[in-house]
């Protein structure tokens, strides 16, 4: 068995031989087959691998640091470029502001005029400075207004002999340029001492400007006092800008013109209403052309049609101008509100239509109530005829309410039927006499038939309108319970509906042509009821036609 010393010696010799021949670079401790390799090889390998990894991580960290440095440098360059660009933009903006101001002054530079044209920069304040006097000003005399002072003091401060600063806030919807002009008077050297319009007004109040459009499309802003009204009265309301108030004024004028044109179409050339339902409107009351509309609204009156009425004592032209050529509001009709409810609020054609409907309903109800009774009686007569087939006499179903001339003739013919006075127990009626009084030429008159409960002949006078003929009818009806019926044929005609005329006329013609025979005395109450109806001519209760 080979000892470790021998193995070491052999390994050293082999290593020397390999070193001479350019062999492997393994250390003696790592030579294959050595005891050191067998015993301590894992510990040495771990010791050698640690520095290798440390070097690689160091290299990676260095590379990352270098990359970060390069990025930092690039960002610094970009920031510098951005800063330079921002500075250039700011410088260009300042130069543009200075170059955009065109100061136009007269040749002598009078101190009572100043016109400055400012290029618009939306949402920013621009300070315009200009000396009122020709003499140069010392730095100590000049006064400046910062943003804080603008917030605390008035927006504009004017002082003769001092530096003038006007702070203007432009609106986004404004036009490209605004001309700010201020013309103070020569006596307004001390504007704070004298509160007048123009430059002499008190500048303690905020600067108010009104815009007016000219032919060039530029708005001119001129400061004005609250009490002074400019030529176009915009009627500014609280919280509205000058442009908004101007737009509202234009819109209001257009709406008034449209309303006037619309209402003018509803009138004829004579000035009257062309529509029939406008005729019931109240007549126009004379009003002053310059009467303010707000006063009427405050009184709570409702406005009528805003149009020109007929020319009255103060003649007014079609364009709404009063005498003297002064423009004014058109005459208006003032009406008083009504508290009526329901159908009482209807006026004119609507009220007439409603009344017509009520009349039609009433006539229909009357016709229905009048047609119910005749139909019931006709059914009763038909049933009676069916139950008594043995009877030889014929009882025609008569119409109790004749309305046509034919029906009147039939009833008058029936009433002229007379009984023989000498034979009270005669059971048959005499044939109809159509020749008495000219039945065809009779007019509606008053026919009275008196039937009493007593036995014996009763007198029944019949009077005609001309009074030429009178006939006494003798009735031998001994049946008790008969009543008096009197009616006027004109009233019958009035109560009869129009659809009953044809049927009544046919029934009257049948009565004229059919002979009537009276039933014997021994027949029961049916005959009495039939006689009652046939003589009275009316189906209803006693006294009804």
UniProtKB/Swiss-Prot annotation:
Which sequence positions carry the modification called Phosphoserine? 404
**What segments bear the compositional bias annotation Polar residues?**
328-341, 361-374, 457-474
Basic and acidic residues bias: start-end ranges: 7-18, 342-359, 380-393
What is this protein's name? Coiled-coil domain-containing protein 9B
InterPro entries (UniProt xref): DUF4594
Q: Where is the composition biased (Low complexity)?
A: 225-242
Q: Where is this region: Disordered?
A: 1-32, 175-245, 262-545
Q: Which domain of life is it from?
A: Eukaryota
**What are the alphabetically sorted keywords of the record?**
Coiled coil, Phosphoprotein
User: Which residues, by range, are in coiled-coil regions?
Assistant: 52-99
Tell me if Coiled coil is a UniProt keyword of this record: yes
Report if keyword Repeat is assigned. Answer: no
């Amino acid at each position: 068995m080979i000892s470790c010393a021998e193995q070491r010696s052999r390994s050293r010799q082999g290593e020397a031989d390999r070193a001479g021949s350019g062999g492997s670079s393994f250390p003696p401790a790592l030579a294959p087959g050595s005891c050191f390799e067998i015993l301590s090889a894992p510990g040495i390998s771990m010791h050698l691998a640690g520095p290798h990894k440390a070097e690689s991580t160091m290299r990676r960290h260095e590379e990352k640091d270098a990359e970060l440095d390069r990025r930092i440098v690039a960002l610094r360059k970009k920031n510098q470029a951005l800063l330079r660009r921002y500075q250039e933009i700011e410088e260009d903006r300042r130069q543009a502001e200075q170059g955009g101001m065109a100061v136009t002054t007269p040749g002598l530079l009078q101190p009572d005029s100043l016109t400055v044209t400012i290029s618009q920069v939306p949402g920013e304040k621009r300070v315009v400075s200009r000396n009122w006097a020709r003499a140069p000003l010392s730095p100590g005399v000049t006064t400046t207004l910062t943003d804080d002072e603008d917030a605390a003091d008035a927006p504009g401060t004017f002082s003769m002999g001092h530096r003038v600063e006007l702070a203007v806030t432009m609106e986004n919807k404004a036009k490209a340029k605004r001309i700010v002009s201020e013309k103070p008077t020569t006596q307004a050297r001390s504007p704070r001492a004298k509160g007048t319009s123009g430059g002499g007004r008190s500048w303690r109040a905020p600067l108010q400007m009104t815009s007016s459009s000219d032919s060039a499309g530029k708005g001119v802003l001129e400061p004005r006092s609250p009490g002074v009204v400019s030529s176009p009265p915009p009627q500014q309301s609280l919280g509205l800008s000058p442009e908004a108030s101007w737009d509202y004024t234009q819109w209001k004028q257009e709406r008034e013109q449209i309303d006037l044109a619309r209402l003018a179409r509803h009138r004829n050339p004579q000035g009257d209403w062309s529509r029939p339902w406008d005729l019931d409107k109240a007549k126009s009351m004379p009003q002053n052309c310059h009467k303010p509309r707000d006063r009427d609204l405050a009184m709570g009156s409702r406005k009528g049609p805003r149009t020109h009425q007929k020319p009255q004592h103060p003649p007014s032209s079609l364009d709404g101008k009063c005498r003297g050529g002064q423009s004014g509001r058109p005459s208006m009709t003032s009406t008083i509100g009504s508290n009526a409810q329901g159908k009482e609020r209807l006026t004119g054609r609507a009220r007439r239509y409603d009344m017509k409907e009520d009349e039609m309903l009433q006539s229909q109800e009357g016709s229905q109530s009048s047609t119910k009774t005749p139909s019931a009686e006709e059914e009763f007569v038909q049933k009676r005829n069916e139950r008594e087939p043995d009877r030889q006499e014929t009882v025609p179903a008569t119409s109790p309410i004749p309305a046509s001339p034919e029906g009147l003739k039939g009833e008058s013919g029936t009433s002229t039927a007379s009984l023989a006075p000498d034979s009270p127990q005669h059971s048959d009626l005499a044939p109809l006499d159509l020749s008495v009084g000219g039945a065809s030429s009779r007019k509606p008159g008053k026919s009275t038939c008196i039937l009493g409960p007593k036995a014996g002949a009763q007198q029944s006078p019949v009077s005609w309108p001309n009074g030429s003929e009178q006939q006494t009818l003798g009735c031998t009806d001994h049946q008790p319970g008969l009543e008096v019926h009197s009616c006027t044929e004109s009233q019958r005609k009035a109560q009869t509906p129009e659809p009953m005329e044809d049927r009544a006329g046919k029934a009257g013609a049948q009565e004229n042509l059919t002979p009537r025979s009276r039933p014997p005395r021994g027949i029961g109450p049916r005959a009495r009821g039939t006689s009652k109806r046939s003589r009275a001519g009316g189906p209803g209760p006693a006294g009804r036609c």
